[in-house]
Amino acid sequence: MLSHPELWAFATHWYRLLDVHAPLESFRPLLSEDVQLVFPESTVTGFEGYGDWYNRVVAIFFDEQHTLKVADITSDNGDSWSAHVVVNWKASIWNPPASSSTRLMMDADQTWDLKRDSSGALVVSRYVVNGMTYEPGSCKL
């Protein structure tokens, strides 16, 4: 069983780790071994693929702030679940040799597939960014 409060807490924790640029290993217990992550710029599989993606993005974005807006269970198969997630993401980007950074501000619409690992912990097995809605004044990816 997966409850809405558990999903909300899991997603909030996930985004907090992204905000603080937590050590990569902090994400290992949150991802299934065969995880697939579909981002606008690439699709990655496994923890190694996630690690490559993560190390790239933490070198690009700073002053990140993720605010969870929606985390709804959309499918319950007993031992696996799908969730609709919407997060408001704000981040700064500096592209050398620009004299200043730019600010990214958007809602990211996502679908997460989740299951329990062998210890019973909740993990993401598939993570898809469905689309992004930019706020007025935001730079674009």
Model-assigned labels for residue ranges:
Residues 38, 90-94, 115:
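A generic structural motif
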